[in-house]
């Protein structure tokens, strides 16, 4: 009888903990949708997506004619370039690590400091940034208008516009394509949808630690992050290599003292393949990144074993990347600017 009572108590204990974890999971996380979300002020159409795809891969949006969106946000790998900071115009290096474009449509805003409200606003930045594509709206529009096929594609994608091939419509088309770059059906998504067998015991232990330690307080929602802004170094600031003192994050946008060293929480979907980590791009090991966040944000000394379990869970956030065929780009004409290297 004592044995039976003991086994029943053990069963009840584990059942209670499973129910408790399930309740916490539903509070923190949402499965990634498999369909394109509704985009504010930019109804998505097949014509816009097709045009946006061409623009995304076309290096002629840059002043040099050799840098495309895909250069720094490579869809063949992880939607970024796996470099500490991106290499742009004239081999110049940017100041921050390039975030992945996959699932970026679900972020509260774009860029580490949230200076772009949405993807169409974000697309304007790199095109005009001196160390990235080094171009300007007038040059980009002139370049694309030199190719009749682009003119026709814009007229089909924006039939309501009197001047279809405009800089605003260029960025709207890019946004339409980027909104399709979703990576659903990760192991964790399946778990969120009710498949208890999709995660191993160690992955579940890692998830439990992720919640218990407080990681999920900043990294939750659809994108497991990307929903709000937080100071980097709540408890203890990391070293200058990881948190450069001259990069004050969101302060550069708001000029509000309380926003110094505040950054958008990094979305963790596909984090296992998006190294290096942090806005400085100086940490290559995911376990090390977990330990740094434990010290800096939570005041927690995360052990090697705990970091291993948490990273085991983080690997379950890798979803199915879309299969994307390279587009055939419009042919250059005699008035199309030549590449400048």
Give names to the regions the model predicted.
Residues 1-24:
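Bacterial Sec-dependent N-terminal signal peptides
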Residues 19-341:
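Periplasmic c-type cytochrome electron-transfer domains
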């Amino acid at each position: 009888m004592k044995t039976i009572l003991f086994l029943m108590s053990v069963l009840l204990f584990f059942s209670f903990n499973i129910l408790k974890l399930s309740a916490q999971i539903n509070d923190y996380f949402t499965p990634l949708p498999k369909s394109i979300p509704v985009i504010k002020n930019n109804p998505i159409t097949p014509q816009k997506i097709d045009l946006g795809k061409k623009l995304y891969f076309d290096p002629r949006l840059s002043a040099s004619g050799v840098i495309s969106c895909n250069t720094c946000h490579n869809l063949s790998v992880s939607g970024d370039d796996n470099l500490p900071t991106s290499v742009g115009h004239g081999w110049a290096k940017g100041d921050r690590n390039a975030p992945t474009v996959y699932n970026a449509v679900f972020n509260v805003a774009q860029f580490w400091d949230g200076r772009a409200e949405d993807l169409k606003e974000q697309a304007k930045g790199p095109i005009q940034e001196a160390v990235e594509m080094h171009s300007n709206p007038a040059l980009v529009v002139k370049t694309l208008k030199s190719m009749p096929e682009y003119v026709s594609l814009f007229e089909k994608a924006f039939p309501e516009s009197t001047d279809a091939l405009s800089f605003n419509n260029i960025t709207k088309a890019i946004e339409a394509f980027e909104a399709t770059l979703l990576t659903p059906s990760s192991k964790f998504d399946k778990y969120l949808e009710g498949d208890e067998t999709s995660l191993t015991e160690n992955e579940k232990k890692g998830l439990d630690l992720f919640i218990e330690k407080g990681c999920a307080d900043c990294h939750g929602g659809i994108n497991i992050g990307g929903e709000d802004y937080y100071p980097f170094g709540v408890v203890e600031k990391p070293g200058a290599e990881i948190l450069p003192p001259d990069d004050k994050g969101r302060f550069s946008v708001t000029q509000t003292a309380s926003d110094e060293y505040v950054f958008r929480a990094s979305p963790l979907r596909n984090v296992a393949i998006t190294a290096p980590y942090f806005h400085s791009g100086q940490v290559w090991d995911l376990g090390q990144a977990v330990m740094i966040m434990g010290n800096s944000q939570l005041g927690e000394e995360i052990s090697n074993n705990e970091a291993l379990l948490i990273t085991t869970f983080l690997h379950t956030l890798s979803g199915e990347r879309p299969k994307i065929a390279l587009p055939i780009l419009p042919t250059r004409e005699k008035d199309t600017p030549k590449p400048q290297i």
